[in-house]
Regions:
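His/Asp/Glu-rich, glycine-adjacent segments
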Residues: 15-188
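Acidic helix-start/capping segments at beta-turn-to-alpha-helix junctions
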Residues: 1-8, 83-86
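Alpha-helix capping/hinge segments and adjacent helical runs
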Residues: 7-8, 12-17
Length: 188
């Protein structure tokens, strides 16, 4: 696997990209000569997002799909990830839902492939705790004082330790690539 999408598909399906049909996040459609996203699907619009998504390009089952089969459909399966491709490819075809953080709004979103509206608990989380509501006050800084002053490398560390605020139109994409997103995924 060469990127997040092909790695997610390989891990959850247990087979290489050759077999699961997910070679990367995007590939070139030979008929239209345009890039195609691995989970793009115009048949299934997004919920709380303008992005469309489904696992229909994934040609194999996932571990979650197999869990649904072996429990006669009784298993409850959700995939929660910062990124659309990781959530949808991890959820697979039979999941109860897949959730990711929307790049434009910073809210948790999903696809109509799984349901027509977010479950009430996800709607409540978006109202009370969505990344969009917290991102303005969020600053990433090194956890350890040693990391911020590099005292183990140099005799005197920098006077201004590194900090990063999430601002501007790319703030949600930046947040999704920071370590802080792990707590957000856990809380969701």
């Amino acid at each position: 696997p060469i990127d997040r999408a092909s790695a997610s598909a390989a891990i959850t399906s247990g087979v290489a990209p050759y077999y699961n049909n997910i070679a990367g996040q995007q590939w070139l459609n030979r008929e239209t000569l345009r890039p195609v996203g691995c989970v793009d699907d115009a048949k299934y619009s997004g919920i709380n997002t303008n992005e469309t998504a489904s696992p229909n390009k994934l040609s194999t089952s996932t571990i979650g799909d197999e869990l649904k089969v072996c429990t006669g459909g009784k298993a409850i399966e959700y995939a929660i990830a910062p990124f659309r491709d990781a959530a949808v490819l991890s959820a697979g075809h039979a999941a109860n839902g897949a959730f990711w953080i929307d790049d434009a709004s910073g809210n948790w979103c999903s696809s109509r492939f799984y349901f027509n509206a977010l479950p009430s608990w996800a709607q409540a989380y978006n109202r009370l705790n969505a990344p969009a509501a917290k991102i303005g006050q969020t600053t990433w800084e090194p956890y350890s004082i040693l990391a911020s002053n590099f005292s183990y490398f140099m005799q005197t560390g920098p006077q201004n330790p590194f900090k990063h605020k999430f601002t501007g139109p790319q703030r949600y994409q930046q947040f999704k690539t920071s370590g802080l997103v792990n707590a957000e995924v856990t809380n969701m």
